[in-house]
Design a protein with these regions (language model features):
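N-terminal binding-site loop/beta-alpha segment at the start of enzyme catalytic domains
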Residues: 1-77
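Beta/alpha (TIM)-barrel catalytic core signal, keyed to glycine-rich beta->alpha loops juxtaposed to Asp/Glu
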Residues: 3, 124-312
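Short, well-ordered coil/turn segments that N-cap beta-strands
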Residues: 11-16, 47-50, 72-76, 113-117, ...
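Active-site mouth loops of central-metabolism enzymes
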Residues: 21-34, 86-101, 127
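Short, acidic/polar
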Residues: 30-43, 95-111, 154-162
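Hydrophobic residues in well-ordered beta-strands that form the structural core
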Residues: 52-53, 66, 80, 152, ...
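A short, structured active-site edge motif that brings together acidic residues
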Residues: 75-88, 119
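Active-site groove signature of glycoside hydrolases
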Residues: 108-127
Length: 314
């Protein structure tokens, strides 16, 4: 497993990380704890060093799970996210200083860590970031040696830009072949500020694996049932043809491999956060990710032209 620097934080992380939202059962069907443990243990065995979670995943249960499984692995880098008041009905976003401090202490206890490696604000609004109160709390915790680095997990170009201008050192964003706008629009700022990028949704929730029929149906408790309309999904599946020429049968053996290698080919990405729900899926992803060069310059350039043409015709 190759490692990359996490921006200017001084932290090195495996270029493939384990995301735990899918393991928590949120957005999908529940997963037995034994299956969760198996994926975490397999990730460790394969050299994964970054584990991404949030205090809201499984209502805190996923943090506790990682705390148990990683207790004997202090070298593992844990990323957690704060900012969801799960005691409210319904749950709501909350970023006032008192709540952030209390949430941090609860996460620290569940994770069994005196020092948490990376803490991110979890989908804060533009106004929350602009006020800077929540970020100031995390900076105080970093100054006190309670966390090693902090940042934000955000949606959208404008919010990401505000976060960067606020001086955050770590940014988590969705990034894949069909969702690259944030990274493309903010490339200069990210590079100039040396921001560490954690890329999630790298396979677009399974779409980029290329294994769905046009009439794919999702269970009612699967978040993807509300993510796309039938027409949207059929259009997206047809657009996979833009990626298929990257599959060469030797180094790039599947559409899934091509999509993952597209993300890893971007040197701004510190870590591609995977979301497997089984050890088998994790094995496949890590095997197919390969090593640098992930896609040849010619293949990558031609792919980007095809993707740009898709956006132009949308």
């Amino acid at each position: 497993m190759q490692e990359r620097p996490l921006g200017s934080t001084g932290i090195s992380v495996s270029e493939l990380g384990l995301g735990t939202w899918g393991l928590s059962g949120d957005g999908y069907s529940p997963l037995p704890e034994a299956d969760q443990d198996a994926v975490i243990e397999r990730a460790l065995a394969l050299g994964v060093t970054l584990f991404d979670t949030a205090d809201s995943y499984g209502k805190g249960a996923m943090e506790a799970r990682l705390g148990e499984r990683l207790a004997a692995h202090p070298q593992a880098v844990i990323v957690t996210k704060l900012g969801t008041d799960r005691e409210a009905s319904p749950a709501r976003k909350r970023f006032d200083p008192t709540f952030i401090r209390e949430s941090f202490e609860r996460s620290r206890e569940r994770l069994k860590r005196d020092v948490i490696d990376i803490v991110l604000l979890h989908n804060p609004s533009d106004s929350t970031l602009a006020r800077g109160e929540a970020g100031a709390v995390l900076q105080e915790l970093q100054n006190a040696g309670r966390i090693r680095a902090w940042g934000a997990s955000v949606e959208g170009v404008d919010t990401a830009r505000i976060a960067i201008h606020q001086g955050i050192k770590v940014l988590e964003v969705a990034y894949n072949a069909f969702h690259s706008r944030t990274m493309q629009h903010l490339e200069v700022e990210i590079r100039n500020q040396n921001v560490g990028i954690l890329a999630h949704s790298v396979l677009a929730h399974g779409l980029l694996c290329g294994q769905w029929p046009f009439d794919k149906q999702f269970a009612n408790n699967d978040h993807r049932s509300e993510r796309w309309t039938g027409d949207d999904l059929r259009r997206r599946i047809s657009q996979l043809n833009a990626i298929r020429p990257c599959v060469n049968g030797s180094t790039v053996t599947s559409l899934r491999a091509a999509a993952l290698r597209y993300v890893l080919s971007n040197d701004l990405v510190s870590c591609a956060v995977l979301g497997p729900r089984s050890s088998l899926q994790l094995d496949q992803l890590i095997r197919e990710a390969g090593r640098d060069p992930y896609l040849s310059p010619e293949a990558l350039g031609a792919l980007q032209i095809r993707l740009d043409n898709l956006k132009a015709s949308a």
